[in-house]
């Protein structure tokens, strides 16, 4: 590992030791964050897969009923029955924080247009029970479908944050900290060499002075 290009002084040694302490502490905090993010991410992925499976199954069942309804009803009557929306939906998207990751939190409100609370956008005279079943199932899918969108977006954002954190952890672990350790070791070695050199010079001066005194 290449060391940093710095002057081998005691002041620089003190500064680098402080940087190493900060980097080591930061590495531990980021590693802990990475581990916790991974734990939550795995739980979220499992829940996402289960939720997606449920939603796909519900949609498949609803489509089966639509196919049956289409077989029993004319295309014109079917299209006319589902042409006009029965309810209005308003969606509020807020943000919640999970381990420094801002993920969406979705809430929606449903408002049926007529007073009797019926979810069916048609009368019952010319339509089939299969169409009723399809509409009812689609109506019940919406909350889960919205939750699925929320969970999948949260999963994506957490995956991005895990990757960012992993890069920072690796940069500290494999580059910054080893460079600091190598540079500190180099400065300590240079300072020890300087001390030994200074001590040798002092010993030589002392010897010379002693010889001068003996010759007097």
From Swiss-Prot:
A biological-process GO annotation: proton motive force-driven plasma membrane ATP synthesis
Keywords from the named record: ATP synthesis, Hydrogen ion transport, Ion transport, Transport
GO molecular function, one term: ATP binding
InterPro entries assigned to the protein according to its UniProt record, in alphabetical order: V_ATPase_D
NCBIfam families: PRK00373.1-2, V_ATPase_subD
Record's function text: Produces ATP from ADP in the presence of a proton gradient across the membrane.
Similarity comment text for this entry: Belongs to the V-ATPase D subunit family.
Name of the molecule in the record: V-type ATP synthase subunit D
Species whose genome carries this gene: Clostridium novyi (strain NT)
Upper classification of the organism: Bacteria, Bacillati, Bacillota, Clostridia, Eubacteriales
């Amino acid at each position: 590992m290449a060391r940093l290009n710095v002057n081998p002084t005691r002041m620089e040694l003190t500064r680098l030791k402080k940087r190493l302490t900060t980097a080591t502490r930061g590495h531990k905090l980021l590693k802990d964050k990475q581990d916790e993010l991974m734990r939550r991410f795995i739980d979220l992925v499992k829940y996402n897969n289960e939720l997606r499976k449920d939603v796909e199954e519900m949609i498949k069942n609803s489509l089966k009923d639509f196919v049956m309804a289409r077989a029993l009803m004319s295309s014109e009557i079917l299209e006319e029955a589902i042409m006009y929306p029965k309810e209005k939906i308003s969606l509020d998207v807020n943000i919640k924080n999970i381990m420094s990751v801002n993920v969406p939190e979705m809430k929606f409100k449903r408002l049926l247009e007529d007073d009797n609370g019926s979810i069916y956008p048609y009368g019952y005279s010319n339509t089939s029970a299969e169409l009723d079943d399809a509409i009812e199932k689609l109506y019940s899918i919406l909350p889960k479908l919205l939750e699925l969108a929320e969970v999948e977006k949260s999963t994506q954002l957490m995956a991005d944050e895990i990757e960012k954190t992993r890069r920072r952890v690796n940069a500290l672990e494999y580059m910054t900290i080893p460079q600091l350790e190598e540079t500190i070791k180099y400065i300590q070695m240079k300072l020890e060499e300087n001390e030994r050199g200074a001590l040798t010079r002092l010993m030589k001066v002392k010897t010379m002075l002693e010889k001068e005194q003996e010759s007097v």
